[in-house]
Amino acid sequence: ACADALERLGARVSRVDAGRDLAEVLVRLSPDVCFNALHGAWGEDGCVQGVLETLGLPYTHSGVLASALAMDKTRAKAVLAAAGVTVPGGGLYDRRLAAVIKPNAEGSSVGVFIVEAGANAPPQAIAADDWALGDEVLVEPYIPGLELAVGVMDGRAMTVTEIVPSSGFYDYEAKYGEGGSTHVLPARIPPEVADRARRLAEISHAALGCSGVSRSDLRYDAVNDILVLLEVN
C-alpha cells in the first residue's frame, strides 16, 4: 500500500524484502531514500536502521536509538513513566489475577498470552524448549476495556482509532488475518478521553525520540476511567 501510494505521487519505487542480502541489494539499487515499512524484530528494533546508517542511506521514521528503545518494552516503560505517561505495572503478580505475558522485544503481538484469573501456571508455550522469542518475558496486569491506537505524524497526534477484535484479544491473527478485527474511526469514547489519548501519544513520541510517524497502543477502562499507554510502535 505504501509503495502504491508513493508511485501514485510520481516516485520511482523498488520493493525490497529485508533478507540476509539486504545490504547487498541496497548497494546495488543505490536509492535516494528508503521507506521503512517493516514490522517487528529487525525492522522496528534498530537493526535495519543501523544497516541503513552504515550504508549512508537516508530513511523514513525513527532512528536506531528510538527504534531500539521503543521495541524494548521494559526500558521504554521506564522512559515513558519518567515523562509522566501512565503505563502498566510490571513484575510478579498474584496468580489469582488475570495477567498479560509478552516477549520483552517483539512486535505484532507475537508471543502475547492472556493468563486468565485463577490460572496457576504460565502458558505451556513459554516453558517449552522451542520458545524462540528470548529468555525475558514481561508480565503486566490485565487491563479490561477498549483497545485504542493513536498515530503521531511529525509530533502531532491523529484521530484515535478503536480496535475491536472479532474474538479474544488483539493478537497476531486479529491484526493480520482476514476479518480478524474491526477498526472504528473515530473511537467511540468521550472527547476528553480522546484528547488524553492523543496527548499521551504525543508525549510518548517525543520522550522516546521518535521521528516521522509512530503509533501508540493504549487501553481504556471506562468503568474506572483509566487510560494506559501500552507501547509505541
Residue ranges and their predicted role:
Residues 122-199, 226-228:
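Phosphate-binding site of ATP-dependent enzymes
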Residues 141, 205-233:
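Conserved metal-phosphate-binding beta-hairpin within the catalytic cores
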